[in-house]
Amino acid sequence: FLYLRDGRIAAEYAPRDLLLLPETDVLGMGLRSPHEGKCLPAPSVLDESPAVLKTAGLSKRIRKEVVFDDVSLSFPEGKVTAITGQNGAGKTTLAQILCGLAKQTRGHILIDGKKARAAVRRREIYYCGNDTSTQFFTASVAEELLLNAKLTEESKGRARHLLKEFGLYEYRDAHPSALSGGQKQRLAIACAVFSGRRILILDEPTSGLDGQNMRLIAERLKSEARSGRTILVITHDRELIESCCDTVVEVGTKPGEVQ
C-alpha cells in the first residue's frame, strides 16, 4: 500500500504492517480503519422520539417485480437512520418515493402524522443523490450553496462558515465541475445542510471518501440530528454507520422485505 500526502508518496506499507498501525496513527493520517467493526441493531420499537416521517403499508412493484411490499417504518426526529442492503435491493427507490421523486404502487407516506402528497414531500425533504455530477446548476461553488437562499449578510456568513468547515472555501469561485469527486460529495452534503429542510435523505454520501472526510461528514450529521433534523443515510459504509447512525433499516434481506 502506498500512502500519498500532498501529491507525494509519504510511506509504503505491507498489508500486515498496515493492520498493525496504531489507531491514533490511522486517524492522524486521515485513513479508514482497516479493521472490521460491528454494525448497529435494527431500530427499536421502544424509541420514544417523535416520528416526523412515516410509511404505512408502502409497496412498490416495477412491472411484475416486487421491489418491497407492505413496508411500515418510522423515522424519528433528531436521529440518523442508516438504510442498508445489497445493490439493487431497492434502497434508492425507497428514498426517491419518500421524497416525492418516484411513485409508490400502494401505501402512504406521512409527515407529522398527516398524509403527505408528493408535492408536499418535495418541499419538506431534501434529497442528495449518489450521482453528484447531475446535481449542480450554477457557475461557482459559492453560488451553488446560495442557490435557493435569500441573499443576506447572515446567509452569506453561514455559507462561508460551511464552506470552510467542509474544506471548500478556497474553491468558492471555482465551477463545481472542476472539483474532485470527493469535493463534489462534500459540496452536495453542504447544500443539503444549508437548505434548512428538516428532513434530509443522503444517498451514499461518503462513498469513496477518505477517513478524515468521512469523519467530518459523520460529525456534521450528528450535529444536525441534535438540532432536531431527521436524517436518512443510504450507505454501505460500515464506519459511517458506526460513527453517526442511531438505527439501521435493512432493505432486501428477502425479496420485497424491509426490516
Task: Put a short name on every predicted segment.
Residues 175-179, 183:
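Conserved ABC ATPase signature
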Residues 99:
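Helix-to-loop junction immediately C-terminal to a conserved catalytic motif
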Residues 200-204:
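Catalytic Walker B motif of ABC-type/P-loop ATPase nucleotide-binding domains
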Residues 154-171:
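Conserved ABC ATPase "signature" region
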Residues 8-31, 252-259:
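Conserved beta-strand-loop-alpha-helix hinge in the C-terminal portion
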Residues 84-86:
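The feature captures the beta-strand-to-loop junction immediately N-terminal to the Walker
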Residues 107-121:
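Conserved ABC transporter NBD signature motif
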Residues 192-193:
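ABC ATPase C-loop
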